[in-house]
Amino acid sequence: MQKSCDENEGTPQNTPKADEGHPSEDPPQQAGETLQASGENVREETEGSHRGEPAEPSPEPKEDTPARHLNPEEVIRGVDELERLREEIRRVRNKFVLMHWKQRHSRSRPYPVCFRP
């Protein structure tokens, strides 16, 4: 049961409490500042990137996908599957467009017509 307005006036319900695990108002420190503050002089690996300089590339190239060593038959099979999925997406999209058109252009409207495009 709801309380009357007079009973609710003195008790704010949605105000956060100050001691509920919220951090203090001190600004957060960067990772480099904490290292310098503790006395360690450790150079970060990405030091050049935050100064506007490009980071050094790694000496060995990384393989981004294991698909480089596929048989041509597997590639053709994958392409066929992608084509099948695109056709299915196209059919479902057309189905939704048709349903939307029917809803907007039906003669029995339970709601006012919206003239948005």
From Swiss-Prot:
Its transmembrane ranges are none
Task: Write out the coiled-coil annotation as residue ranges.
Answer: 73-100
Which InterPro entries does the annotation name? TF_A-like/BEX
The segment annotated Disordered runs over: 1-82
Q: Name one GO cellular component term.
A: nucleus
Instruction: Mark out the compositionally biased spans (Basic and acidic residues).
Output: 41-82
- What is this protein's function per UniProt? May be involved in transcriptional regulation.
Homology family? Belongs to the TFS-II family. TFA subfamily.
Name-wise, this protein is Transcription elongation factor A protein-like 8
Q: Which organism is it from?
A: Mus musculus (Mouse)
Q: Which gene holds the coding sequence for this protein?
A: Tceal8
